[in-house]
């Protein structure tokens, strides 16, 4: 029998619905199938693929013979730090930037970065509240003051309009973070920063390989950091990299956490303490660097494969009333970390996110509520004893962050082709949507 609801491609769908103009992609083209008893009400669950096979699909990180060979070669080599220097060269070429420096994680790269900025104590830094604490907490070591900025409730990205409202004469830096691999509007952010005389530090810890206007994330700001932690798109188990457009910033960041041959400082440099650095050792582990180099060779292809699988799934799910995904600019290419982030409009769906997640989980899906911490609500920012200058902590929720925490949920990323499992995921969603009456009361 011919399908009365053929799957539309994304462009055709957007032309029909006008969803792009609304800033969200959603598809009301759904005819409910015959209702089946939900698994949570005693019915048979839809997702039946054995758990071991599901784990194989969703497993991350994924290391194969090339990675194992690279690590073993590093173990056998007498040039212990050769993989570290090689990774720096390759990452610099990949981004097209003048300076990079390895670190043992993204947090140490950020700490070095804040030192390298050489700002007077009390300087304010505009940071997203909805981020990992490492974006913010290292500021306290240098007397810097975080100013918490809201997130765009559609994309999770840095809310530039809120940043404009919070600008003061003490503002020196803004730190846009590319959440889940979604590129921020760096062209607009850079224009704002240039107009106001601000430094831009990209937190690209999630955005390895993402781009805007053909330019990689991490190459847009005055400076940037990356994390290579095991869950990231470029996983070395642990590691990080700082990116710098100016030699002086590069040298200050280097001397803060590196010494001896790693420092690479000229005799004329005011930061020429090659033998000692400034007392810290933030060097990346050479085996992690070897692993990262092997992973870098396949980064773009892995990202492309993940995008393709997300599209295969989402183009079907978005036909269900109330479901949408974060909109991506036509001139941007996002990556995905750590999940496939979606939104539920409870009014259009006819049931709550809580009821949906309960029903989907019972059907065997691995779906989670997208509740992201608002950093300004954590205790460390309100206890003045840890800060030279107390953070400016807004009362209550930031509205964009609150909206995200109300509507967001995540599905696991398919890291290998699994048509049977993907079909079961789609059927589980369709089954739940067809049982709206049962869910409305929950």
Where in this protein do the model-derived segments appear?
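Phosphate-binding glycine-rich loop
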Residues: 80-124, 138-140, 148, 215
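C-terminal segment of N-terminal export signals and the immediately downstream linker at the start
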Residues: 28-83, 89, 93
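Conserved PLP-binding active-site segment of the aspartate aminotransferase-like
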Residues: 329-330, 337-348, 367-384, 406-420
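Conserved PLP cofactor-binding pocket of PLP-dependent enzymes
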Residues: 260-271, 315-317, 356-409, 438-442
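N-terminal secretory signal peptides and thylakoid transit peptides that target proteins
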Residues: 2-21
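PLP-dependent aminotransferase-like
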Residues: 39, 115-204, 211
């Amino acid at each position: 029998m011919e399908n009365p609801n053929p799957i539309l491609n994304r462009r055709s769908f957007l032309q029909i619905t006008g969803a792009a103009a609304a800033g969200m992609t959603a598809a009301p083209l759904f005819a409910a199938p015959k209702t089946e008893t939900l698994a949570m009400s005693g019915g048979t669950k839809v997702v039946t693929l054995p758990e071991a096979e599901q784990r194989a699909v969703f497993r991350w990180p994924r290391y194969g013979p090339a990675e194992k060979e690279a690590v073993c070669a590093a173990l056998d080599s007498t040039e212990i730090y050769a993989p570290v220097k090689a990774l720096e060269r390759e990452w610099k070429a990949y981004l097209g930037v003048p300076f990079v420096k390895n670190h043992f994680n993204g947090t140490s790269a950020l700490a070095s970065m804040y030192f390298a900025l050489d700002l007077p104590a009390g300087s304010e830094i505009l940071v997203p509240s909805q981020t990992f604490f490492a974006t913010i907490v290292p500021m306290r070591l240098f007397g810097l003051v975080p100013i918490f900025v809201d997130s765009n409730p559609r994309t999770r990205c840095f809310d530039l309009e809120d940043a404009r409202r919070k600008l003061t004469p003490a503002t020196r830096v803004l730190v846009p973070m590319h959440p889940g691999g979604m590129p921020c509007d760096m062209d607009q952010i850079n224009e704002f920063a240039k107009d106001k005389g601000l430094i831009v530090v990209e937190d690209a810890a999630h955005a390895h390989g993402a781009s805007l206007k053909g330019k990689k994330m991490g190459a847009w700001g005055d400076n940037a950091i990356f994390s290579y932690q095991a869950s990231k798109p470029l996983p070395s188990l642990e590691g990080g990299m700082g990116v710098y457009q100016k030699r002086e910033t590069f040298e200050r960041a280097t001397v803060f956490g590196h010494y001896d041959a790693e420092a690479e400082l000229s005799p004329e440099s005011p930061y020429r303490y090659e033998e000692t650095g400034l007392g810290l050792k933030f060097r990346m582990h050479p085996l992690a660097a070897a692993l990262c180099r092997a992973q870098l060779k396949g980064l773009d292809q892995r990202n492309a494969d993940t995008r393709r699988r997300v599209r295969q799934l989402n183009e079907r799910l978005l036909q269900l009333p109330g479901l949408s995904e974060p909109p991506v600019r036509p001139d941007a290419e996002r990556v995905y970390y750590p999940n496939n982030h979606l939104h539920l409009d409870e009014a259009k769906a006819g049931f709550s996110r809580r009821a949906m997640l309960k029903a989907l989980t019972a059907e065997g899906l691995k779906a989670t509520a997208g509740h992201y911490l608002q950093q300004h609500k954590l205790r460390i920012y309100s206890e003045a004893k840890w800060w030279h200058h107390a953070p400016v902590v807004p009362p209550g929720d930031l509205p964009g962050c609150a909206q995200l925490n109300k509507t967001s949920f995540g599905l696991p990323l398919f890291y290998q082709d699994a048509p049977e499992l993907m079909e079961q995921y789609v059927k589980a969603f369709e089954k739940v949507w067809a049982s709206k009456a049962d869910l409305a009361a929950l």
